[in-house]
Design a protein with these regions (language model features):
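Gly/Ser/Thr/Pro-rich low-complexity, intrinsically disordered segments
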Residues: 1-212
Length: 212
């Protein structure tokens, strides 16, 4: 992951860090609360009850639903029991897929994720050891597109994952969507090609190459 005190376009950040593919993160600098870990450093310890996504030092996902300090401690202890450490923890959500099944219900209100609104979605999923899936959808700002509610995004991600691996996604997690939704490949933003809007973001999740 990459974070910065200011905001930059995701493609600019990706180029600086030789990212082969990148997506926007959880825009955690929008407020000063939540539970946030980046590159092994805990930046905030003020959980506000969102679903959390933990990524450990082996690259595996762990989740906590509507997490408070007790649930956070449980996940950290479970990761430590594996001989690993938590490298990143994201606080946006919600969790959309768990053990191959969509888990988000349309009737649920979830913080600022616009649960029932059809909009752009950015989703990160784990399919297996060091195997991941990024889902980026268009929304009403894109000509000819309507976007997805969170429940629709959960089902869509679960369906895609099952076409790639028989067991589907281990976990899928909703990141900041809307105009922040940025999917970058080879330093170019490739999602929403008909929408010229490119919002600057404060953090990205990226997969990099050692070759400049």
């Amino acid at each position: 992951t990459w974070i910065h005190q200011g905001n930059r376009q995701a493609a600019t950040i990706a180029k600086r860090y030789h990212a082969v593919i990148a997506m926007n993160g959880d825009f955690f600098q929008f407020n000063n609360e939540r539970y946030i870990v980046r590159q092994g450093k805990r930046l905030r310890n003020r959980p506000t009850g969102e679903d959390l996504l933990f990524i450990d030092s082996a690259g595996d996902f762990h989740v906590a639903h509507l997490a408070r300090k007790e649930q956070i401690t449980e996940v950290n202890d479970a990761v430590a029991a594996l001989g690993r450490t938590v490298i990143n923890c994201f606080s946006f959500g919600p969790i959309l897929v768990e053990q191959g099944q969509p888990v988000f219900m349309e009737k649920t209100d979830y913080f600022n994720a616009a649960a029932r609104k059809k909009t752009q979605r950015a989703i990160l999923a784990q399919l297996g050891p060091l195997e991941y899936l990024i889902v980026s959808t268009e929304g009403p700002e894109d000509p000819g597109s309507k976007g997805l509610t969170l429940a629709e995004a959960a089902q869509y991600t679960a369906d895609i994952a099952r076409t790639l691996v028989p067991t589907g996604a281990l976990y899928a997690y909703n990141m900041d969507g809307g105009s922040s939704n940025s999917l970058v490949l080879n330093y170019e933003k490739i999602n929403s090609p008909k929408n010229p809007k490119k919002r600057a973001v404060s953090d990205i999740i990226y997969f990099a190459s050692l070759v400049p």
